[in-house]
Amino acid sequence: MSSNLLIDAPVPQISIVIPVFNCHGSIRQVVSRIHAVFVKQTIQIVLVDDGSVDDSSQVCRVLAEGSCGRIVFVQLSRNFGEHSAVLAGLSETLAPMVAVLDDDGQNPPEELPSMFAELERKRLDVVYGLYMDRQHHWFRRIGSAFNDRVANIMLSKPRGLYLSSFKVMNRFIVEEIVKYSGPYPYIDGLICRTTNRLGQLPVKHSPRLAGKSNYTLIRLTRLWFNMFLGFSIVPLRLTSILGLVIAALSCVWLIAILIDKLWIAPGVTAGIPTVLACIVLFSGVQLMVLGMIGEYLGRVFLANNGQPQFIIRQIVRGDSRS
């Protein structure tokens, strides 16, 4: 939470965090729609530029400078990833209720009042937006579906809960999330390890206002690895189970070979191709397990070495800068 705000500035009722990346064509419209929805409430909008290469940072800076403190612009020094940007934004929020939505207009701000109402009515900690008609590209939909299946195994989340980027949460969750000091933040993983008071609400999913999706196979893979290795030791347990299964199959195979050599076909020599295939198989499994262990150790090394979650270049709050 920032301590540089003006003392006489009113505490907002709602804070809205928007990670920004190459969205100069849509961010103005998103901010305008938010103001139209919450015209009667005191709100705080936190725009976090995650190393955009277009003029998104300049657009966000202009919005913040003319907002009388209602918009906070956080500029990161480079691209750290969406979840790091969200974490940076959450650390600047002040309101008792906080929302996170995308910068492309696909998460309609008009859905936020009903999501906040659901949060309060059911006394939940987090409410996710459940997209009724997803407008994502087919590639993104496949990646999201796979990510959801993996999350069912890796994270302690309720079955059927869709972990979307469109969500609202209370202050308790925000305060717990910003305590995380590791170098690879995964917001939904932090939420699931903090609480089981999670819900979802059907919401609209709009087409992009401008541009194209910034998600690529590399970004989706990186996100999946953060969830797969950063918030669970299930992969290590699975490799142990895999080792036991292979050992059991090897014993069965050895018994079968002995029976074959002693009683069925004692004069037939075992094939070299079979032996080579087994060596290649077991070598591949060993390298996979070693690579996974190495990834865990590498993450521990980076955490101990002070790998930053994000680096803030500048913060603009109305007429003040820091």
Where in the sequence are the language-model features?
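Hydrophobic helical membrane-anchoring modules
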Residues: 2-11, 186-322
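Cell-envelope/extracellular polymer assembly enzymes that use nucleotide-activated donors
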Residues: 13-15, 44
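Short, well-formed alpha-helical segments that are part of the catalytic scaffolds
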Residues: 23-37
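Conserved donor nucleotide-binding strand/loop of the catalytic core
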Residues: 43-46, 57-92
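A conserved acidic beta->alpha catalytic loop
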Residues: 49-58, 105-106
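Acceptor/aglycone-binding surface of glycosyltransferases and processive sugar-polymer synthases
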Residues: 74-78, 82-92, 109-190, 206-225
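Catalytic metal- and UDP-sugar-binding loop of GT-A-like glycosyltransferases, i.e.
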Residues: 76, 101-103
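Short aromatic/hydrophobic "clamp" motif used to bind/position activated sugar donors
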Residues: 98
